Amino acid sequence: MKRIAIDAMGGDNAPKAIVEGVNQAIEAFSDIEIQLYGDQTKINSYLIQSDRVAIIHTDEKIMSDDEPAKAVRRKKKASMVLAAKAVKEGKADAIISAGNTGALLAVGLFVVGRIKGVDRPGLLSTIPTVTGLGFDMLDLGANAENTAKHLHQYAILGSFYAKNVRGIANPRVGLLNNGTEETKGDPLRKATYELLTADNTISFVGNVEARELMSGVADVIVSDGFTGNAVLKSIEGTAISIMGQLKQIINSGGIKTKIGASLLKSSLYEMRKTLDYSSAGGAVLFGLKAPVVKSHGSSDVKAIFSTIKQVRTMLDTNVVGQLVEEFAKETQVND
């Protein structure tokens, strides 16, 4: 049985969306147990009772505007902190939260702990593409500054995730840069390019420009955390703007526009589904001793269900256990 600890109080739509997502997951998957951390009365308002769902009551929670490290130190009984402690103590196998990203990164690093040999765990997310296959990108903001060695490790981590969780046999790795030529970029990008080219354990396809990302040019995209976070938010904002503009044009158009939209209804639905990140799951802080997954702050029921499904797959494939073994080998070789 896969045991998943969930911060029921994190996110804009908590606890309603969190608990209703859990209800759907419990019905869909018979091999999971959920531990919900948070206000018992509020959780029970939405929970469909099940012997595979336990509520661990706490009144304390980390707010979205709390200073992450300080909040984790001071709020020892916060729902997010208790969920992370359950993982550390072996009472749960993974943690999910839609709450304060910085705080989740802090509990991931200082409570769950990083895998030996991983210098800087990266925030990884699967981003939809027009091909429908998506790509894994990291780092998406766990680290504001990175070295070439960090980015090289992200390529290894991303490839490992793509192989073991998404089932891609030989994932193509691209380095996000301001041009495709190998001479492009700042010193960080140039140094990273050399490391990736020299590593024959990954399938490096070279530099990739931001405009190529949505076309599926690579299965894994490597970036420093600052740039990756900016690109992710740009993609999300563009997708929301496109769908919003289409809706506005259809609603404000005449009868011909509405007839045309009706004829294109199925195509527009497919387009919306392609751009919908809520079905892709959450962002994984990859490189830790257990799955620590950040669901979007505005996650709805569908997004929470998708994140639980994602974590279930991670536990089913034992991707973290395999990663520990992989880096143990690397450490022995380097020693």
UniProtKB/Swiss-Prot annotation:
It is found in: Cytoplasm. Its EC number is 2.3.1.274. Keywords: Cytoplasm, Lipid biosynthesis, Lipid metabolism, Phospholipid biosynthesis, Phospholipid metabolism, Transferase. SUPFAM superfamilies: Isocitrate/Isopropylmalate dehydrogenase-like. It catalyses: a fatty acyl-[ACP] + phosphate = an acyl phosphate + holo-[ACP]. Its main location: cytoplasm. InterPro entries: FA_synthesis, Phospholipid_synth_PlsX-like. It comes from the Bacteria. One of its GO terms (biological process) is fatty acid biosynthetic process. GO terms for molecular function: phosphate:acyl-[acyl carrier protein] acyltransferase activity. It is an enzyme of class 2 (transferase). The keyword Translocase does not apply. The keyword Lipid biosynthesis applies. GO terms for cellular component: cytoplasm. Pathway: Lipid metabolism; phospholipid metabolism. HAMAP family: PlsX. Belongs to the PlsX family. Homodimer. Probably interacts with PlsY. Catalyzes the reversible formation of acyl-phosphate (acyl-PO(4)) from acyl-[acyl-carrier-protein] (acyl-ACP). This enzyme utilizes acyl-ACP as fatty acyl donor, but not acyl-CoA. This is Phosphate acyltransferase. It comes from Streptococcus pyogenes serotype M28 (strain MGAS6180). The lineage of its organism: Bacteria, Bacillati, Bacillota, Bacilli, Lactobacillales.
